UniProtKB/Swiss-Prot annotation:
Active site: S243
Naturally occurring in which organism (per UniProt): Haemophilus influenzae
Protein name per UniProt: Adhesion and penetration protein autotransporter
MF GO annotations: identical protein binding; serine-type endopeptidase activity
Principal EC category: hydrolase
InterPro entries linked to this entry: Autotransporte_beta, Autotransporte_beta_dom_sf, Autotransporter_pectin_lyase_C, Bact_Autotransporter_VF, OM_autotransptr_brl_dom, Pectin_lyase_fold/virulence, Peptidase_S6, Peptidase_S6_dom
Amino acid sequence: MKKTVFRLNFLTACISLGIVSQAWAGHTYFGIDYQYYRDFAENKGKFTVGAQNIKVYNKQGQLVGTSMTKAPMIDFSVVSRNGVAALVENQYIVSVAHNVGYTDVDFGAEGNNPDQHRFTYKIVKRNNYKKDNLHPYEDDYHNPRLHKFVTEAAPIDMTSNMNGSTYSDRTKYPERVRIGSGRQFWRNDQDKGDQVAGAYHYLTAGNTHNQRGAGNGYSYLGGDVRKAGEYGPLPIAGSKGDSGSPMFIYDAEKQKWLINGILREGNPFEGKENGFQLVRKSYFDEIFERDLHTSLYTRAGNGVYTISGNDNGQGSITQKSGIPSEIKITLANMSLPLKEKDKVHNPRYDGPNIYSPRLNNGETLYFMDQKQGSLIFASDINQGAGGLYFEGNFTVSPNSNQTWQGAGIHVSENSTVTWKVNGVEHDRLSKIGKGTLHVQAKGENKGSISVGDGKVILEQQADDQGNKQAFSEIGLVSGRGTVQLNDDKQFDTDKFYFGFRGGRLDLNGHSLTFKRIQNTDEGAMIVNHNTTQAANVTITGNESIVLPNGNNINKLDYRKEIAYNGWFGETDKNKHNGRLNLIYKPTTEDRTLLLSGGTNLKGDITQTKGKLFFSGRPTPHAYNHLNKRWSEMEGIPQGEIVWDHDWINRTFKAENFQIKGGSAVVSRNVSSIEGNWTVSNNANATFGVVPNQQNTICTRSDWTGLTTCQKVDLTDTKVINSIPKTQINGSINLTDNATANVKGLAKLNGNVTLTNHSQFTLSNNATQIGNIRLSDNSTATVDNANLNGNVHLTDSAQFSLKNSHFSHQIQGDKGTTVTLENATWTMPSDTTLQNLTLNNSTITLNSAYSASSNNTPRRRSLETETTPTSAEHRFNTLTVNGKLSGQGTFQFTSSLFGYKSDKLKLSNDAEGDYILSVRNTGKEPETLEQLTLVESKDNQPLSDKLKFTLENDHVDAGALRYKLVKNDGEFRLHNPIKEQELHNDLVRAEQAERTLEAKQVEPTAKTQTGEPKVRSRRAARAAFPDTLPDQSLLNALEAKQAELTAETQKSKAKTKKVRSKRAVFSDPLLDQSLFALEAALEVIDAPQQSEKDRLAQEEAEKQRKQKDLISRYSNSALSELSATVNSMLSVQDELDRLFVDQAQSAVWTNIAQDKRRYDSDAFRAYQQQKTNLRQIGVQKALANGRIGAVFSHSRSDNTFDEQVKNHATLTMMSGFAQYQWGDLQFGVNVGTGISASKMAEEQSRKIHRKAINYGVNASYQFRLGQLGIQPYFGVNRYFIERENYQSEEVRVKTPSLAFNRYNAGIRVDYTFTPTDNISVKPYFFVNYVDVSNANVQTTVNLTVLQQPFGRYWQKEVGLKAEILHFQISAFISKSQGSQLGKQQNVGVKLGYRW
């Protein structure tokens, strides 16, 4: 296809005149989000300056590739906003000559934000390239000169090699990008282009195509925008309308981006090929040398120069130092036209070609001095487009009050120019260069300044009338410059602005007051570099919100809401960060200041009224200019792109935040805010936003500069996940009715202090690591939040804990109140409160409670369990001096072994209904006492309005369970059985000692050792004078031991007599006789009961069951043994089916699965779930019988009472032999196996038991045709080895078991034989099993528990089929027995017979 030059005719060229905008397209791929290309062009989104390894995805979310893998993202600020030119020197741009219509350019951000103060740079000379012998390249090229130095951007360097093939070396030049603003097209997968926008509305950018050709002065690039190229995943092609747009290349050796070419030609309708002219550095050097042909330098230094001139463009410089001389110079020539057509060297590029002879006439001057130079203006000087370059230190001053205007001032690095010359009204001074411009003119300077680089020190001097103004307007742009104040009267703060990328305003120890700070982006920065003097910035807000009539009104000056998107405080560690205070002092309460940049202050932030927001900000994205149709296709909103899931996090730091009025809000996407807060005088401070709720969010529009605050629902998960939790690093002090709320996505790392009716709330999953201290009627609430610190209340303060768990200390002095609502509190130590109210809440008096909780399955150890002394052996007391009210739960840890526990001490005003949940160790008490849990703090009986009940109505300790009783106004743990047992132990021991005392022959001195024992036992008995419970409780647990009752008068008399003897005689050597004497003494001392009491005892014994009296530990031990034995019986059940079956299979497999529930008077019900029995058997048929072997493996999951989990396996090998006499069969069997059982969450060894069994069986078969009736019976003897283990300080001893299993039953079947090779046999089977002779005594600690086994019935129906040599059978059975509930199981058996 013919290549087309992107040339515009006269009308279409007039883009800057606004006549017509005809142009063709920039091509992008529709399969990739258009926003990538837009953000790329404006350095927004992911494509910020310096970004690398940027992932690019297609619209299906698939990774297309990674951009900027070998270079940092380029800074496109050097490209003019219309995209047709790029800045290559301070006032020079480069483009193509056929762009004949544009007359000016501007730089900076897109949008209508008036704070940007966008400046228009006029073309004063087009510098069109003329092809001749000295200039051999294509003449469609020019290097226009601008009337002012550009301050918004630093110029980019040009490549110098004119051989295009040089740049195909991707090792040295690994990255290429281009940018343009031609008419926009999307190319779809079929390579069809759709127009989406006209030309010159906005910029798009991406990487270039691959290099396809090159020559002297040009490069040709080609490719397909639908496919990633060598330079990245975002290829973009230009066409008509993109003429002059730049192409940049990265030099890996120099580590910098360079401008390499400008777009001139290509295939405009396909987006396949682009032709670029290489930039011509040598041509630019010619131009620059022509415009700056006067350089002044005094070899000896201290040069003195005087400039004079007139309006006709003629001037002179007189050198008074060294050898006096005069040099003629050219200045702006007011007699020349302001606008005129420039020279055109190629008629194809004819058109307006506007330039300004008047301004271009002014040349640029260069001054250099190695000491201290001096430049004097003898007349008003207008250099037009000429500027001043200074290298070295100079003083520039007028003879009297002369003025200067020109392109600007460049001060080289490490140089200082003292500037004593005022400017001209409506003229802007451009300050560039890294050096310093020290302004010391006198009076009111009516000219303005734009600072793009280096430093400007403002030290304007007052005139005779006291007038002083350094500049009428001051702007900081590009982020490279600094303006330093030498006093606070240098300018009107309403006339100061931070433009594109801003810069530093150094207060230098002085203070300024702003209504609002005009700012464009986060490049704005206010600092104080003074090392000794503090500075203040005061912001008052707009006084009026009534918009006046007139043009050019900045609407931002009449808004209630204002914003500052820059920084307060220095962030560069190489620069001094002096003390700087920020004061927000609005005139009315309805004003709002949004800080969305950041602060790094050595100083305070103070607020007196209004609303002050600290916030992150939405990530800037390029504006969406697409119409509604195209926007909907892209799935993006029209206009400004703000995605709630894509924000920039901010940080704020100050020494103190003084909120003396109004409301301060730390809003979303603040990653951290550091400093101590003092909130007073009815002020409010809010920290954090709350997911899934409405939150007030303030944002500032980058496009318009307007600030809006609105309520936003944060419900989208993607948005919520994008918001960090704000780290609040500092303390909060509240006083004088102040309020603070820390909520949602916020974490306070510091203490909170409240006085004088202040209020603090921690809520919505927020966190505080620090203490809360309340006094003087203050209130603090923790609601659904995490507080990791202590709470201390004094002077009528109130603390509420709601919907939260708290595990630190609360102390409340007189008059204070603590309220818990749907909350839990774990006390770390002893606690004293005044008033306590519970509303459906729980207080855990000891952190060890959670470690020993038996609400849920506990972690058990089969070995000795060692509990940390610091937790288990430390008991806490909660004392409530005032009133306890409400309803809730108190959780205690206890040790009945030592009669120690957490305690609750209450006043007699206490009332309410409460549950006591007590966790005890497995060790049992060994002395006769009672454990008191709740007692009166003042020895007054507790109120009858106070009620306590035990959780689950019991406490497990060792082998037994304990109840709660109220005795003498206190609440104690009580077990009648254990107390009876311990009481009887005391009686027996005391009687034995007294008997032995009577036989003592040793000296009286030896009796001293025995008396303390007797006294202690006597004291224990005296402490429990109450009538002891009936003997049946003890009988049920002590294996029918001899009945024991309370001491009668007869035993007391006998004891008294023994005591008198014991006082004289004592022989410890006779202690060995105690056990022999105990039984006899029990019989001697046991009182005779009346017939009525005896009958009542017997009836009570009949009604009581062991399972109701034993602890969880005991029940689990009995249930575990029961489950193990029942698994063994299940294996034998399957063998019973084999013995009555006439199958002749040589090998078979059997699978059976069931679910069973067991219950008895000895243990509580448990579930044997998911029992899976698998068997493999072989047998050999003999002449009159058969022999065989069966391998069985069973797995089961058991759930014991209180959800204690157990997993068990059983592996057995059995052998059998059967002999047949006619219809009579007789068989024997023998088996051996091993079981393994383990409690859930165990970390120690399993419980292993070995087992052996043998047995005999017999059956007789009656055949009535095809009907068979077979009665049978059998008996098996089992031997199971003993096993001892320990769990939670409970010692379990299981003796060896030896018991018989009896079974008898009958089987009825009927045989069908359809063919010779097929038989089908349905059957019905009834089996009775009895193992009730097995009654084991399991010992838990010292208590002997009964372990009976029962009997059960089995009813089964099944079907057996034989096809050729294969046999298959299936059955369903139901079982029920004395310990076995109604259960059913199924089985399948598959066999083969050779």
